[in-house]
Amino acid sequence: MSSPGPTRPLRVALTSYRSKPHCGGQGVYVRQLSRELVGLGHHVEVFSGPPYPELDERVRLTRVPSLDLYAEPDPFRLPRPSEFRDRTDLLEFATMCTAGFPEPRTFCRRVAPILAARASEFDVVHDNQALGPALLTVARAGLPLVATIHHPISVDRELEIAAAPWYRQLTLRRWFGFVRMQARVARQVDHLLVPSLSSSHDAIRDFGLRPDQLHVVPMGVDTDLFRPRGPRVPGRIVALCSADVPLKGLAVLLRALAALPDEHGARLTVVSRPQPGGQTEKLVAELGLAHRVHFAAGLTDAGIAELMASAEVACVPSLYEGFSLPAVEAMASGTALVASDVGALAEVVGRDGRAGVLVPAADVGALTTAIGGLLADPARRTAIGTSARARVEERFSWTATAQATVRVYRRAIAEAAAARNAEQQPVA
């Protein structure tokens, strides 16, 4: 395998074990990064498990089917016997039945032989946080491997276990068993992309990584799609967050909404779908918020952008974020943002208060005060929105993300070529 020159277009295999198109960072990352890479003149083929991404027409998609055991409206379904094709399908089903999450491991088992058989067609493989052991066989076969760690899922694990009743904690530990696998594999990948310094520090701490493995490459936002638009709806607050995931802090936001004075006329739209009968639905009922909270699921990117631009305030109440696409989307929309001062959010928003208001995580009183203050002060909302848009335009473009990613690709390719050449040198 010859190494491409320093300016030659690269042939990139971008892998993602699931790529939900319009929500969740993985699908957005795959779509936007692949689009920008081809815009820079590179050739990209995405290999994805379901749900499959929606990609630029210039990007080739190779579907890597699975049993898709978590698909709505029937998650944790029982497959028909005719659906089982091989041992990997059996492993996927058995892992689900024993309370584990199989997809990162089983996706890599499926995609690795495909990549190995087509190794001559690519210059580099870029894994989007599957980090299954089978991917290492691709690297050993001579294909340079780069991986993205949005943040170590160990953070999600600890927060979910802490929030769960005692009788669910053992099951959650089993569910998050794949995290140990990801840490083991990540330690063997020489080039890892992380979106923030915060994620870098957390990956070093939780995954035992070396600082020299990590490259901080912030994500971007589509500033043509997410932009200031027409008039805003009085009192509208928008949050893009998984409704029943403790990490996202929606319960804190709901309690803050309940505490807001009536004169603000505050109404919350959450871009998510709560679990029927789950903790979020119960809390909405308990707080008497059914008339003030609307859940909007299944929106397109354009629909999300229009909604975000119509709000007076956006909120990211997370207990942790490795980057936060919803935060930069709100900022690009010129919408005044209130966010938790955790993880990478201070890196994204800035600490000077010009582009957004940071509050302590899980502090209902502070969140109530911050949101209420913005709803009562149109001039301050406008000033924050203007500064936020300028910050995004300066720091967070997908083109810059793609350019920085290509620099890491070329470094990984050059190092792999040097290692091959060293192996081929005759022993003196």
Model-based region annotation:
Residues 336-339:
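Short hydrophobic beta-strand element within catalytic cores of glycosyltransferases
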Residues 198, 220:
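Carbohydrate-associated surface elements
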Residues 74-99, 139-183:
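Acceptor-binding helix/loop patch of EC 2.4 sugar-transfer enzymes
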Residues 230-257:
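Conserved donor-binding/catalytic core segment of Leloir-type glycosyltransferases
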Residues 2, 6-9, 47-112:
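A conserved catalytic-core segment of Leloir-type glycosyltransferases
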